[in-house]
From Swiss-Prot:
Protein name: Trigger factor
SUPFAM superfamilies: FKBP-like, Triger factor/SurA peptide-binding domain-like, Trigger factor ribosome-binding domain
Organism per entry: Pseudomonas putida (strain ATCC 47054 / DSM 6125 / CFBP 8728 / NCIMB 11950 / KT2440)
Domain notes: Consists of 3 domains; the N-terminus binds the ribosome, the middle domain has PPIase activity, while the C-terminus has intrinsic chaperone activity on its own.
Domain PPIase FKBP-type, chain residue ranges per copy: 161-246
Enzyme Commission number, as recorded: 5.2.1.8
Length: 437
């Protein structure tokens, strides 16, 4: 077999393969012999059909089948021989497939980039440290109470944080518009759920009162037909209800699946959850900085095939998450390219770090991570057992642990500065990660 390889770009390869005619004919004959054993042709007993007849009837199909199998087999043999690592399936261009001649074809494909991870010493990481103070715990308890607010009808003017039941009709240029009218809508004033000016126009209103509120739709409003336009809403207030926060009692504690019947016990459970979230937030911020540093220090070219696959995967995820009747391929590629490229590049870099430093998932850390996740459930031992009985779930945890070991490896060489901050600052969502160049 003859093989020649041309580098048509940094990652694209054009491989020409010639399979000897003798091997081709052997493959064709092999298929014809198999066909002869089972062929049923009028006038002949099964298995006794002359080969000349078999050739007349089935050689074209046998040759086509042999072509497909030989292309696949010889391509694999060629990439092993040439020590190439394709990043996707090849595009095959037949050149010659005549009887009695060599089978010749061209395979065009991309290879994975070859590189060594560098610049670890140039990476700078700010590692936060924080504690859950009593004031943080008090604030969290208030958040939990507000999340479980109930409303009771009152006979007074509406104010911010009250819930109003309203009917409304909206008009633009004197004409009602689609989606601009509703009845029995519940709205918490000050929630920012409606466009600017709508909720403010209801402060001070009482049950049974009708108000006319003039607003302007934002320039970036999702409905382009309404964006930037002035509108008039006629609003009828059906009722006004004031918020009532629940008491911190056993009934309230039970809503969170916590068996503790005392405030002290509930506070201890909430603190435990906050500390777990704090550890995860700090870990995530460190990881993001490490990944950003790896990206900046290791600019690599991405195989188009990998990028296309990742974009398609993100499209499918988006459709599954947001639903609707749209098909994944209808979503614009541009929406996902940046995220897809970051994921692909980081995947290649992380894999190279694993290879370069000979990393393997630490079983003790895998167990520790599973126990940490299980601690958030009422029956942690059952959760732990479930993970170890499900290979797919266990492998996902092992992958996360391996990625954490990559982060730890980088931190050993990076410049790390520690900074003490408040709980709020530590758990505040990080800025969007940097894009791959």
């Amino acid at each position: 077999m003859q093989v020649s390889v041309e580098n048509t770009s940094a990652l694209e390869r054009r491989m020409t393969i010639a399979v000897p005619a003798e091997r081709v004919e052997n493959e064709v004959n092999k298929r014809l012999q198999q066909t002869a054993k089972r062929a049923k042709i009028a006038g002949f007993r099964p298995g006794k059909v002359p080969m000349t007849v078999i050739r007349q009837r089935f050689e074209a199909d046998a040759r086509q089948e042999a072509f497909g199998d030989l292309v696949q087999a010889s391509f694999y043999e060629a990439i092993v021989e040439q020590k190439l690592n394709p990043a996707g399936a090849p595009a095959v261009e037949p050149k010659s497939f005549e009887k009695g001649k060599d089978l010749e074809f061209v395979a065009i494909f991309e290879v994975f980039p070859e590189f060594t991870v560098a610049g670890l010493e140039s990476i700078k990481v700010e590692r936060l440290s924080a504690e859950v103070a009593d004031s943080d715990l008090d604030n969290m308890l208030e958040v939990l109470r507000k999340q479980n607010t109930r409303f009771e009808a009152v006979e007074r003017a509406a104010q911010n944080d009250d819930q109003v039941n309203i009917d409304f009709v909206g008009k633009v240029d004197g004409e009602a518009f689609a989606g601009g009218s509703a009845k029995g809508t519940l709205l918490v004033l000050g929630s920012g759920r409606m466009i600017p000016g709508f909720e403010e126009g209801l402060v001070g209103a009482k049950a049974g009162e009708e108000r006319v509120v003039n607003v302007t739709f934002p320039e970036d409003y999702q409905n382009l037909d309404l964006a930037g336009k002035a509108a008039e809403f006629t609003i009828t207030v059906n009722s006004v209800s004031a918020p009532v926060l629940p008491e911190l009692n056993e009934e309230f504690f039970a809503q969170f699946g916590i068996k503790e019947s005392t405030l002290e016990g509930f506070r201890a459970e909430v603190r435990k959850n906050m500390e777990r979230e704090l550890r995860q937030a700090i870990k995530t911020k460190v990881k993001n900085q490490v990944m950003d540093g790896l990206l900046a220090a290791n600019p690599i070219e991405v195989p188009k095939a990998l990028l296309e696959n990742e974009v398609n995967r993100l499209r499918v995820q988006a459709v599954q998450q947001f639903g609707g009747n749209i098909k994944p391929e209808q979503l614009p590629v541009e929406l996902f390219e940046e995220q897809a490229k970051r994921r692909v590049v980081l995947g290649l870099i992380v894999a190279e770090v694993v290879k370069q430093f000979e990393l393997k998932p630490d079983d003790a850390k895998v167990r520790e991570m599973i126990e940490e996740m299980a601690s958030a459930y009422q029956e942690p031992e059952q959760v732990i057992a479930w993970y170890y009985k499900n290979d797919q779930q266990l492998n996902e945890v092992r992958s996360v642990v391996l990625e954490e070991q990559v982060v730890d490896t980088v931190l050993q060489k990076a410049t790390v500065t520690d900074k003490s901050v408040s709980y709020e600052e530590a758990v505040k969502p990080a800025e969007a990660p940097a894009a791959a160049e």
